[in-house]
From Swiss-Prot:
Organism for this UniProt entry: Bordetella avium (strain 197N)
SUPFAM superfamilies: EPT/RTPC-like (SSF55205)
Protein's name in the database: UDP-N-acetylglucosamine 1-carboxyvinyltransferase
Localization of this protein: Cytoplasm
One GO CC annotation: cytoplasm
Length: 421
């Protein structure tokens, strides 16, 4: 099993190209199921999750041709309407095939999802919404089994804001009969990106980017070309890294406009930020200031950035309060950060982070995707060597992270098998 070995203390300098957004690419790949025509995508990140999604689509009969960050898809010979457990268990985003399959083919069988073990993350809102559109849904042998002759437009209000739920219902509604109104919809940039692709495919959608999306169903969708937006979480992670190590880095292929809350908090921490079309520069000198955060749905502070900013707070000059409002059980990185010398107490959904003058390297274990990133940031700032185990979590959502960091001057390497012994 691969690990990362980091020798901390190196300041980061240089430029890094940010990859396409994982949380945009996954639903967009699934949207190819909505048409028999070719869908041509660019800026698709090279991640374990995108590779898993392409394997899943391939098992269904979708033809896919990949060349670096470009993917051409065509779902004109779909022969399976099932997403099996062996693929779904590693990636909860597999549930995103449910809406497109049901809308176009009238049937879908999707195993209950896996992915990061962060709380319950239920799919009940997906089911509730699809049932409102006329689907008959049962649970059979661990599968969500959905059937509908043709979905019919309806007003759907989810009990909570759910990004994947909004995306599933948005895709399903594009081919439904009549008008669908999604209330309490997610406003994330990745939802907007999906909607923009669907509009290129012939969907009639208004209000994406607000909490009320209106979809007028059409008979069929056609092919399209689309460029996936840049990954705001990867961008934020690299800015947290330079905040922890000090230095001067410039991010390319990124968009400051979709990173408001993250940039605000990093500025508060003492990172000097400049930005322009397609780039963000982060300069850090001295010790970071403590920054309190409360996670919220977009445009609030993203739960996917909570662990990384906590890593920055561990070496801040003071105490910070971190409140996790989105997912339960999303402080699994705290125990590992404490192994590096962090001073953190947890009380329910709140963590109290008392900054220390320095962290010291140790062997730690990644528990989920963003926790992995927080340990990388802490390891970069720590004195001595840090060895991070279970980095397959990191590979799910970061495109060649250690190579990008090494190009910025970090002392980081991937070790395989028994190299670390």
């Amino acid at each position: 099993m691969d690990k990362l070995r980091i020798t901390g203390g190196a300041r980061l300098h240089g430029e890094v190209v940010i990859s396409g957004a994982k949380n945009s690419a996954l639903p967009i790949l699934c949207a190819s199921l909505l048409t028999a025509d070719p869908v041509r995508l660019s800026n698709v990140p090279q991640l374990n999750d995108t590779r898993t999604m392409l394997r899943l689509l391939g098992q269904m009969g979708v033809k896919a041709e990949s060349a670096q960050t470009s993917v051409n898809l065509q779902a004109d010979q779909v022969h399976s309407l099932e997403a099996p457990y062996e693929l779904v268990k590693t990636m909860r985003a597999s549930i995103l095939v449910l809406g497109p399959l049901l809308a176009r083919f009238g049937e879908a069988r999707v195993s209950l999802p896996g992915g990061c073990t962060i709380g319950q993350r239920p799919v009940d809102q997906h089911i509730k919404g699809l049932e409102a559109l006329g689907a008959q849904i049962t649970m059979e042998h661990g599968f969500v089994v959905a059937r509908a002759k043709r979905l019919k437009g309806a007003s759907v209000r989810t009990d909570m804001v759910t990004v994947t739920g909004t995306e599933n219902l948005l895709m399903a509604a594009t081919l439904a009969e009549g008008q669908t109104i999604l209330e309490n919809a997610a406003r994330e940039p990745e939802v907007i990106d999906l909607a923009e692709l669907l509009i290129k495919m012939g969907a009639r959608i208004q209000g994406h980017g607000t909490d009320r999306i209106v979809i007028d169903g059409v008979e069929r969708l056609h092919g399209a070309d689309h460029t996936v937006i840049s990954d705001r979480i990867e961008a934020g992670t690299f800015l947290c890294a330079v905040g922890a190590t000090g230095g001067d880095i410039t991010l390319r292929n990124t968009d400051a406009a979709i990173m408001g809350a993250t940039l605000d908090k990093l500025t508060e921490a003492g990172l000097h930020i400049e930005s322009g079309p397609g780039w963000i520069r982060g300069v850090m000198n001295g010790r970071p200031k403590p920054v309190g955060i409360r996670t919220h749905e977009y445009p609030g502070f993203a739960t996917d950035m909570q662990a990384q900013l906590m890593a920055l707070n561990t070496i801040a000059d003071g105490t910070a309060i971190v409140v996790e409002n989105i997912f339960e059980n999303r402080f699994m990185h705290v125990q590992e950060l404490c192994r590096l010398g962090a001073d953190i107490d947890i009380d329910g959904h709140t963590a109290v982070v008392r900054g220390v003058a320095r962290l010291s390297g140790a062997t730690v274990m990644a528990t989920d995707l963003r926790a992995s990133a927080s340990l990388v940031i802490a390891g970069l700032a720590a004195e001595g060597d840090t060895l991070i185990d279970r980095i397959y979590h990191l590979d799910r959502g970061y495109d060649r992270m250690e190579i990008k960091l090494r190009n910025l001057g970090a002392r980081i390497e991937r070790v395989t098998g028994k190299e670390d012994e």
